[in-house]
Amino acid sequence: YDPAYASVIVNTEMWPDTMQYEGKTYTGNTEKTLREFLNKGGRTGFVGSTDTHEGKPAAKTAVLAGELTRPAIFEALRHRRNYAVFNAKIVLDFRINSHFMGEEIEIQGKPQISVNVQGTDKIEEIIVVRDGTVLHSLQPGTPNAKVDYLDEAFSGNSYYYVRVIQADKDEHGNRSHAWSSPIWVKNK
């Protein structure tokens, strides 16, 4: 990872199992997982794309742009205001202290995490991840859900992202899910 090139290496393709725990990844090499990249100080936003070779798109990228124009979309991607979705069109709003996903922020006090999800089916689980480990999870069982969580154990320098898992499955048994781009937080 070279921070000099961070503005062009802002997105990473999200496979359904790229971010799994216990060292079980698509590549079988934990050094190549996004979690390892982030733990080593890497900065990237998460996008979804497909490589099914069958013409059946499943993964998508949601972009939080101020308007529906090419310049606004590319500006949002450069600032990592995007997230990956697999199968369903899940709407995900993840913020810390009112700052959007993709931002690097300095705060006083503890991070106030806010997650709003609008799913297309029941939300099985919302997972807040800090520095590669689960910080908080909620099993709402409804299509729409909100999480407000204060990270009392904040150490002063962390990254956070959110995973959303829906109850529905595709024809291969894969659940619809979404990954927010991270937010990097430091104490002032």
Q: Can you say where each PLM-predicted feature lies in the sequence?
A:
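Surface-exposed loop and adjacent secondary-structure segments within mature catalytic domains
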Residues: 1-19
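Histidine/acidic residue-rich metal-binding segments in metalloenzymes
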Residues: 1-5, 28-42
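Alpha-helix initiation and N-capping motif
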Residues: 8, 30-31, 70-71
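C-terminal functional module detector
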Residues: 14-23, 34-188
